[in-house]
Amino acid sequence: MLGLKGCLTILIGYVIAVCALFSSRGRNPSLTDWEKLKDQKISNIDNFGLTGQHLLEFFQENLPFLSFSEEKYRHKHVSLYYDVFKEYILRRANSKKCLPVDSAIAKLNKDVNPMPVHSHNDYWRKLPLFEGLAYGASSTEADVWNIDEKILAVGHNEAYLDPVELTLDKLYTGPLLEILDEVNCQDSDSDRKNGVFFNSPETSLFFYIDFKSDDNELTYKLLMEQYFKSLIDSGYLTYYDMKKDEIIWRPVTVILTGNYPTSLDILDNGNDNGYFESNQRFAFLDAPLLSLEPKYSKLSVAATVSFSQLMKHCGSDHWKVSLRGRMDSNEISCAKSIIDGAHALKLKTRIWGAPTWPANLVETISRQIIHDLGSDLLNLDNLFMASSLI
């Protein structure tokens, strides 16, 4: 029979166990795990079992522990967050083992459906390319500047470019090639290519290249002969087949916007049979939505207009819409007819420059653009908001 001292010992132990149980329920389990494993190197971990938004949140919450004992992260390339995330995502991309189900795409967006959203100013995000793919955004963009006639740096303002780390190949074309090689390893010679969305491998990623430099001809030459060449050689870029007079869809569709060249002589390198004399054109023009012509059905896959231009064309003003809080029936009818005209040419549509504040106005106008006007790509900076509106 237990004495008083023994009973008290058991009771105290029981109380401590119960308190520990309830206190652990109030803690972040992922953070608790990483507090215990903070000496574990991220390079020893292949898959956390998280995808999409949950993966992004996990990295943001646990970044100090994920990089705690990694000497290589002492000197950043883009940022600590980007460097650690990219290393984790692409770790197995260059391995000899062919296993698409455990690929970078599987880590990024398994169980995430592609959404008709354009990742506006994607290069400004903490994780260029990767964040948009994690949310399932089916369109992205990069502003490019020609540096020393040989480097395409990515950035919004010429004064803040980094021609060493923030370049088109390091942020976009390089990772895209690794990702696509990984999910097409089983039959690399097949005409059927898997894309960058796990749940929808047939969906093509629209990749807008915004020309910023004056010498657009040289920029285009660098794109074709340097930055996109490996993607072209691997069969990953959508192209216009000059012989068949049709568009052949592939995992990535390049759309030129901004100060891009429009001359076919430049686009096809002075040849009648395409830039590489293969009867293929691998870049499409961002067509002007308000002045479409039949020729754009072959030159383009998408047409764009700013919200202010669209409202002005419809006899209104974007400030009136903002003050009212929504587009009225006349504005909707006019804008929808323009979008229907683009659809008749088999072009997708994108409207940029819609109100960005306050949040309720953004949500209302965004829903009207997608649901009432029938526009194809919602142009938003906030991907979390976009995912809740589609």
UniProtKB/Swiss-Prot annotation:
Signal peptide: 1-26
GO molecular function: phosphoric diester hydrolase activity
Record has Transmembrane as a keyword: no
Disulphide bond pairs: none
Keyword field: Signal
Source domain of life: Eukaryota
Single GO biological process annotation from the record: lipid metabolic process
Family stated for the protein in its record: Belongs to the AIM6 family.
Name the record gives this protein: Altered inheritance of mitochondria protein 6
Naturally occurring in which organism (per UniProt): Saccharomyces cerevisiae (strain JAY291) (Baker's yeast)
